[in-house]
Design a protein with these regions (language model features):
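Low-complexity, S/T/G/P-rich flexible repeat/linker segments used as non-globular hinges
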Residues: 135-162
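Short amphipathic beta-strand and strand-loop transition segments with alternating hydrophobic
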Residues: 109-116
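Internal catalytic or translocation cores that form aromatic/hydrophobic pockets or channels
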Residues: 52, 106-108
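Acidic, glycine-anchored loop motifs typical of Ca2+
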Residues: 128-136
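N-terminal single-pass transmembrane signal-anchor helix
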Residues: 1-34
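Short, glycine/small-hydrophobic-rich surface segments
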Residues: 43-48, 53-101
């Protein structure tokens, strides 16, 4: 008669060590990917903002880019997404650009600023994804040259995983 097979303590130890090794590799990668999805909000927002700014400058050649708008919302969300109170995005520049961080009532993790000077602009997104008080910064720029507005290639990024 054959004895039913049992899992020995050695086999359990081997299985646990393999599982532990897999988790040691997978969990940090997963955490980085989760953070990366959050900073997509900043890059997508700046892409929309840059496109709107270039369209505004091309449509208003006598004015160029709109005037500056302060960091909006003024208090950068810290470690959690925030929903803006009504009126947060009513600044004339945000209205001229048709821009807000997210649709009304949808939480977001970044604040945005626009520094316009007629023939050039810098758009900035600032956030604190982990809530430690250290802000990440994303910037894109644009210029009016040779009669047409355009975005400067590349994006400045500082501490993107903060």
């Amino acid at each position: 008669m054959k004895r039913p097979s049992r899992i020995t303590p050695l086999e359990i130890a081997i299985g646990a060590s393999i599982l532990g090794s897999l988790l040691a590799v997978a969990i940090p990668s997963f955490a980085r990917n989760v953070h990366a999805t959050h900073f997509a909000e900043a890059t997508d927002g700046l892409a929309r903002l840059g496109t709107q700014a270039v369209a505004h400058a091309d449509a208003h050649k006598d004015v160029g880019f709109p005037k500056s708008a302060p960091l909006t919302p003024a208090e950068v969300p810290r470690g959690a997404r925030a929903v803006d109170p009504p009126g947060t995005w009513d600044h004339p520049t945000w209205t001229a650009l048709g821009f807000r961080a997210s649709p009304e009532g949808i939480p977001h993790a970044f604040s945005f600023a626009f520094d316009g000077a007629g023939s050039s602009f810098t758009a900035r997104a600032r956030g604190d994804l982990d809530g430690d008080g250290v802000l990440s910064t994303f910037e894109t720029r644009g210029v009016v040259g040779a009669g047409a507005a355009s975005l400067t290639p590349g994006m400045y990024v500082e501490a993107e995983l903060e």
